[in-house]
Amino acid sequence: FDKSGHYKWQNFDQFLTIYEIVTNIFLDEKNFEALVRHVLDKQVKENVIYTEIFLGPHLWSDRPNERWERFLNIASKVADEYEKKYGMYTYFIIVCIRHLGPEKALEASRFASKFKDKNVVGFGMAGDETKFNTLDFMRSFDFAKQSGLGTTTHAGEICGAKSVDEAIKLGVTRVGHGVRSCESEETIINLSKENILLEVCPGSNIALGLYP
């Protein structure tokens, strides 16, 4: 921790390590439900009426099992409660963890496609942008798209514009971050041509030292 009590890291690898350690706190179902409620309470205070939340099931268990379904049911139950109480719509994007590899990604994609009735609207990829070739995950994204899910992947934050070019080839409808697209005029043009939205998060970019 730093002097103000915040988590402290020196690089992206350390950030990912700390992130995964912290997620262990939420392997308890009561803690996980409390986390979902905390997030949605903050949204209500900000007068947000539509929210999409990333859920990474491989952080709950290293393989698909009934635990995945239980945790999704918890999140979906809370989302329905807040919709009835506050009129706020909450949906989920199931994400694979890139550095766990393509086979794990396919597990997450199949899970997302199976539970579209549980407020799941999309499939995405987070994690270490430097691991594996982006196109190694094509099968997972194709499966999700064929199931009618929206798709997104992190690119263009830790890695440069080339990583965004690879994300475009996946056929995603959004790119998480994507800020380093500005390093290539061609990348910007291609994003525009394909009508791909950038999910920009300045807080992450600053926290990870990408920008001062």
Describe the role of every protein-language-model region.
Residues 154-158:
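Glycine-rich beta-to-alpha transition loops that act as phosphate-gripper elements at the mouths
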